[in-house]
Amino acid sequence: MKKIINPWKGKEGYNCFGCAPANPVGVKMEFYEDGDDIVSQWHLQANYQGWINTLHGGIQSVLLDEICAWAILRKLQTTGVTSKMETRYLKPVDTTDEYVLLRARI
């Protein structure tokens, strides 16, 4: 896997909740290219819980939204914003696990 360099890192005003490394409350995602896939391994943190030992659904949506945006950026060489997102959660994400692995493909 090859790490994707964040083109906005260090730019004035860049404070993305999903991927800005300097955002003190953000999730600070990093991304890698693995063939056709964009991958992120995000380390779970108890301060993002919605319920005891359960990752908040809004944070799960952020992780999904962010990796999709990076797939668009990397594979289509353009940026965009989410206009609609519908999510059905199949099972809870346990915050006592070490990490969650996200993978996106166009």
What is the predicted role of each segment?
Residues 67-106:
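Hydrophobic beta-strand-centered segment that forms part of the acyl-chain substrate-binding groove
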Residues 12, 25-27, 36-40, 58, ...:
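A generic structural signal for short beta-strands and their flanking turns/coil linkers
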Residues 3-9, 25-28, 51-54, 65-71, ...:
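Generic detector of short, locally flexible boundary/turn motifs and exposed helical patches
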Residues 10, 18-21, 46, 50-53, ...:
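Generic structural "secondary-structure junction" signal
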Residues 1-47:
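Non-catalytic linker/capping segments at the edges of enzyme domains
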Residues 39-66:
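A conserved, well-ordered hydrophobic junction motif at loop->secondary-structure transitions
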Residues 13-15, 55-58, 72:
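Short, charged, low-hydrophobicity "junction" segments
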